[in-house]
Amino acid sequence: MDGEEDSEWMMMDVGGKGGKGGGGGGAADRKKRFSEEQIKSLESMFATQTKLEPRQKLQLARELGLQPRQVAIWFQNKRARWKSKQLEREYSALRDDYDALLCSYESLKKEKLALIKQLEKLAEMLQEPRGKYGDNAGDDARSGGVAGMKKEEFVGAGGAATLYSSAEGGGTTTTTTAKLMPHFGSDDVDAGLFLRPSSQHHPPPPHAGAGFTSSEPAADHQSFNFHSSWPSSTEQTCSSTPWWEFESE
């Protein structure tokens, strides 16, 4: 294709400079297109060397049957066309790179906007719990502290376990469990409620002068026995004589 284009626009003057009135030939005689063989030889030489020295031009012109001036003009025009095509190729490559960069820029711009929106949503989510639950946090802490002070167990100065209970009306009562229930163990005291008698502690033996009189029936005395292991009436005395007779004496 390049050879055909070159043959169309490269028409060299093969005749000499004649006078105005000289009838050597017309314009068609003075101009001649390059043949295909000449164009191929010139292009092969141009592929190896874009600019020829005067000696190389003369030798190539002799081989092709052309004038050195024709060879020089052909190489000059060919270099101009070659540079123009090279610039077009470079421009096309740069244009493609620019389009790719522009597309990448637009994609990154959209991604940036999406990330900004996502960041704003996360910031709103972080601020929402503070405004919604921040005021109630203090109330929960205060109510928890009051509930914790409802019922607490302390140890008195004398070593006896005491139960401290705070009433809602503001009054406080402190009672010593050892004074109230001497027959119950410490494991039976659960939040101020005495549910069952202790199986590990037995009541002390009756003191002299503090027993029941003989006028009281025995059935009434036996009704105060709390434990099944409480000794019977026969086991409380060393003989068969009831123990209240000794006390009455």
Curated annotation (Swiss-Prot):
This is Homeobox-leucine zipper protein HOX6. Expressed in seedlings, roots, leaves, nodes, internodes, flowers and embryo. SMART domains: HOX. Disulfide bonds: none annotated. PROSITE patterns: HOMEOBOX_1, HOMEOBOX_2. Residues 212-242 have a biased composition (Polar residues). Probable transcription factor that binds to the DNA sequence 5'-CAAT[AT]ATTG-3'. The gene is HOX6. Residues 85-129 are annotated as: Leucine-zipper. It is found in: Nucleus. Residues 15-27 have a biased composition (Gly residues). One of its GO terms (cellular component) is nucleus. GO terms for molecular function: DNA-binding transcription factor activity, RNA polymerase II-specific; sequence-specific DNA binding. The keyword NADP does not apply. Residues 27-86 bind DNA. CDD domains: homeodomain. InterPro entries: HD, HDZip_class_I_plant, Homeobox_CS, Homeodomain-like_sf, HTH_motif, Leu_zip_homeo. Keywords: DNA-binding, Homeobox, Nucleus, Transcription, Transcription regulation.
